[in-house]
Amino acid sequence: MATEGHAPTASEYVIHHLTHLNNTGHAQENIVDWSVINIDSMFYSIVIGALTVFLLWKAASKATSGVPGRFQGIVELLVEMVADQAKGIVHSAESRKFVAPLALTVFVWIFLMNAMDLLPVDLLPRIWEGVYAAGGGDPAHAYMRVVATADLSATLGMSTGVLLLCLYYNIKIKGVGGWVHELFTAPFGNHPLLYPINFAMQIIEFVAKTVSHGMRLFGNMYAGELIFILIALLGSTATVFGFFGHVIAGSIWAIFHILIITLQAFIFMMLTLVYVGQAHESH
Amino acid sequence: MENVLGFVALAAGLIIGLGAIGACIGIGIMGSKYLEASARQPELMNALQTKMFLLAGLIDAAFLIGVGIAMMFAFANPFQL
């Protein structure tokens, strides 16, 4: 790693910014490792989740039927947008009472977590290095990744949550017997010879939906964050070209990234609604 | 060791390049169809727009998952011996 003597090389800088602050102190070796907990992702997702719930609660508590303020205006806009989408997809009003607020929370939560990507790359990690060094640690090992949705374990965790919700609604709407019957007869019809194929198709469908749902958000945010890091490398060359390149390329990518952030949060919300809606219709 | 890194770099480039071909063609076709439809029926423009953005995200999904994995190969290289 970067010893005190010289500044980090380009790849050390990138790898340093890609390493999570986890309970093992170094990067995660193998792909699946249940013992590793990414403390920074947990911290940022929980804090931003609490902020989301607080914002929506404050808007709801201060809602007046009179002239709405800007804050209430934007929350109303969001609620109407999510309600319209939910009405179009989830047809049972009774389960919509739970699913629409869930979709709204998911949208605002993921949007705010994604928006952390717009902060300068070194802002929070450098503050954390100071705190870490003050606490007696070696600053070169003070890792921090600010964007929780650029962490595969976080996004797959969210999509697994959506999967569990779908299983719950499948059982609630169709009953365990109805759902198990559907599992074995769904795509190709009710013939004993087709049972294994039907069951395999259903399992593949559930797994594919969950993995693509989580990986899509991860892929977009990870690529976006990495491009911000690479642009920051441009600035670290401390040349006039490098500095202006960093400022121009960084602002262009940040402006485009605002669209990606909103779009990915919208897509995650829409797919949550679509998957729960699918759990209602029988095949 | 150099061979591994060389092939990893090639793999990352191929993943991103081929993924980009698919995503761009898909969005190009969808965009042209969307413009055609909104030209033919302007009142449907808004409804189609939200669906177009949703589909644009879905089309980009495979490409950006590939880009995510290719960049993971490039920087946090799991193939180092």
From Swiss-Prot, chain B:
TM regions (residue ranges): 7-27, 53-73
Keyword Ribonucleoprotein listed: no
Source superkingdom: Bacteria
Entry-linked Gene3D superfamilies: F1F0 ATP synthase subunit C (1.20.20.10)
SUPFAM superfamilies, per the entry: F1F0 ATP synthase subunit C (SSF81333)
Chain positions of site Reversibly protonated during proton transport: 60
Membrane topology listed for this record: Multi-pass membrane protein
Any Gene Ontology CC annotation: plasma membrane
A GO molecular function held by the record: lipid binding
Keywords, sorted A to Z: ATP synthesis, Cell inner membrane, Cell membrane, CF(0), Hydrogen ion transport, Ion transport, Lipid-binding, Membrane, Transmembrane, Transmembrane helix, Transport
Subcellular location: Cell inner membrane
Physiological role: F(1)F(0) ATP synthase produces ATP from ADP in the presence of a proton or sodium gradient. F-type ATPases consist of two structural domains, F(1) containing the extramembraneous catalytic core and F(0) containing the membrane proton channel, linked together by a central stalk and a peripheral stalk. During catalysis, ATP synthesis in the catalytic domain of F(1) is coupled via a rotary mechanism of the central stalk subunits to proton translocation. Key component of the F(0) channel; it plays a direct role in translocation across the membrane. A homomeric c-ring of between 10-14 subunits forms the central stalk rotor element with the F(1) delta and epsilon subunits.
Family recorded in the similarity comment: Belongs to the ATPase C chain family.
Subunit-level organization: F-type ATPases have 2 components, F(1) - the catalytic core - and F(0) - the membrane proton channel. F(1) has five subunits: alpha(3), beta(3), gamma(1), delta(1), epsilon(1). F(0) has three main subunits: a(1), b(2) and c(10-14). The alpha and beta chains form an alternating ring which encloses part of the gamma chain. F(1) is attached to F(0) by a central stalk formed by the gamma and epsilon chains, while a peripheral stalk is formed by the delta and b chains.
The protein, known as: ATP synthase subunit c
Gene source species: Azoarcus sp. (strain BH72)
Lineage: Bacteria, Pseudomonadati, Pseudomonadota, Betaproteobacteria, Rhodocyclales
Gene name of the encoded protein: atpE
